A protein has these predicted regions:
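A cross-family phosphate/adenosyl-ligand binding-site feature
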Residues: 1-129, 135-206
């Protein structure tokens, strides 16, 4: 009997600037045939409209035509699938993660589905990745980040590096999207790892 399950990732989008990161992570998860359980906060929906021009939540547009892999769950529905600890998945990522969401999770507040799913992910000792995007950080943000790190969350600021010599905004977005997928244990072909980048340079030299 084959008990293997498809890889599942829970993904939350909140109202911090950084919609291109969320879009790219979803595209890459879909390319890897990962099932995506998506919840978008009210301000996250506004973010998608403001930064991507997406007036309606369109799973096909978020995954380059692989909307069949996406299950959208209403952020007001605290009884949705991802709110239950019995729902098995390989990790949750909130990208971008606002300071408001960060503070709520750190305080144990579950006022919406994203916050509830994050709390459940922590209590079940599953992987929770918080792709925070705020600058500068207040002292309250720093304390919340420390508290969540101690609770087991992986704090992943959306701070792309420049050592791979990015030439476009897309290169910067891919840098962080690749890092997030690495943390989730999802395969990708992006040139975002330093050792593989050096090897690729050697192979491509005349």
């Amino acid at each position: 009997m084959n008990n293997s399950r498809p890889q599942r990732i829970v993904l939350g989008i909140t109202g911090a600037s950084g919609a291109p990161y969320a879009l790219r992570v979803m595209e890459l998860l879909a390319e890897a045939e990962v099932e995506i359980y998506l919840s978008v906060s009210k301000l996250g929906r506004r973010l998608l409209a403001d930064e991507l021009g997406m007036k309606q939540l369109d799973p096909d547009a978020l995954t380059s035509g692989r909307g069949d892999l996406v299950t959208i769950q209403n952020d007001n529905d605290l009884g949705a699938t991802i709110a239950s600890g019995s729902f098995l998945h390989q990790g949750m990522v909130i990208v971008p993660c606002s300071s408001n969401t960060l503070g709520a999770i750190a305080a144990g507040i579950t006022g919406n589905l994203i916050q509830r799913a994050a709390a459940v992910t922590l209590k079940e000792r599953r992987k929770l990745i918080l792709a925070h995007r705020e600058s500068p950080l207040s002292h309250i943000d720093i304390l919340n980040l420390a508290k969540l790190s101690e609770a087991g969350a992986i704090i992943t600021p959306l701070s792309p590096g420049f050592y791979l010599m990015p030439r476009t905004i897309e290169d910067l977005v891919d840098f962080m999207a690749g890092k997030i997928l690495d943390l989730l244990g999802v395969e990708h072909d992006l040139d975002t790892r330093w050792d593989e980048h050096l090897q690729s340079q050697k192979l491509n030299r005349p």
